[in-house]
Structures are given as C-alpha cells and as structure tokens.
Regions:
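Conserved class I S-adenosyl-L-methionine
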Residues: 1-44, 138-163
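Class I SAM-dependent methyltransferase SAM/SAH-binding core
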Residues: 41, 49-96
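A short acidic, Gly/Pro-enriched loop at the edge of an enzyme's catalytic core
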Residues: 98-105
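Residues lining the SAM
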Residues: 109-111
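A short His-aromatic
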Residues: 114-116
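A short glycine-rich, Lys/Arg-flanked "PGG" loop and its adjoining helix->strand segment in the class I
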Residues: 123-135
Length: 163
C-alpha cells in the first residue's frame, strides 16, 4: 500500500487541509441528523486528525485504515492527547469492513471512496458501512466528480520549485 511509505510525512504533505472547517461541517451535519454522541467510524482515517477531533467532541471512535503505519501515527497522537481509551483502531480494507457491532454514524473524507474503483466495489463498500449502521445512522463521505478536474484543477496552474 502506497500510504505506508509516507505515513510519517502525510500530515506535513497534507498541511493545507482545513481540518477545523471540515470538523465544523461534519459535526454540524451529525448534530442536525441527531447523532450528537455514540460510536462513529472514520473509514480511511489515515493519521487521524479528524478522528481525534471527533473523539475530543465526545464520540467513541473507530478508526479504520489499510495502512498500519498510518494507524501507528494516529495511535501516537491519541496517546499524546490522552484519548486512546475512546478510540479503537482497525487495520482493514473498507471493502471487507467488520466492526463487530453497530455504529451511530460513519465519516470518510479526503476522497477515500474515490480510490475504491468500479461501481460494484463502491457499492460493496457502501453496503458494508450500512450493514453496521444503527437505524437512523448517518454516513458522511466526499467524492471527486468530473467538476473538480474540469472546473477547479483546469482553472489553476500548479508547479514545484526546485532546489
């Protein structure tokens, strides 16, 4: 898995991500749908910044990722914040998700579901998350659509500065 190679650099490389805005949006959606507490899963949690924000907001979290190295970084952060007792980390492929119980909701951000592949795999991943969802549960996820490469990326120039 490619993410194993740079797990300890991921946060630095992803440094421009606005986790505060993402958290505010997700927390607002969870509250609006009656999921103000309980167990949530962060599917494709990576190094867990959002996972930890939700833990600190009072949720019991399950962080799921394929990369043991990403989970190791998350584990270190949770230990530093003193929230490890409210966090279960599972190294799993979300196509074969097994949470061993029900959840009130799930989140999956930063285009995790874009990496799943063709529609049958996507449908399977959604079905696995839904299988563990309590009645009335909420699943919040993001996807890139043709809009982004056509309108956002095409309208910008990207480059790298050399040494």
């Amino acid at each position: 898995m490619a993410y194993n190679e740079f797990a300890y650099f991921y946060d630095e490389l992803n440094g421009e991500a606005d986790y505060d805005a993402l958290y505010t949006y997700i927390k607002g959606q969870l509250d609006a749908h009656g999921v103000a507490d309980g167990i949530l899963a962060d599917l494709g949690c990576g190094t867990g910044d959002l996972t930890l924000m939700l833990t600190q907001a009072g949720y019991d979290m399950i962080g799921v990722d394929q990369s043991e190295e990403m989970l190791a970084v998350l584990r270190e952060k949770a230990d530093e914040l003193g929230v490890s007792d409210r966090l279960l980390l599972l190294r799993q492929d979300i196509l074969d998700l097994d949470l061993f119980g029900t959840i009130r909701g799930a989140v999956s951000t930063f285009d995790t579901y874009n990496h799943i592949g063709p529609a049958p795999r996507f449908e399977r991943a959604i079905a696995r998350a839904a299988f563990f969802m309590e009645e009335g549960g909420v699943f919040l996820f993001d996807l890139n659509t043709p809009y982004k490469p056509r309108q956002v990326v095409a309208a910008n120039e990207f480059g790298m500065e050399g040494p």
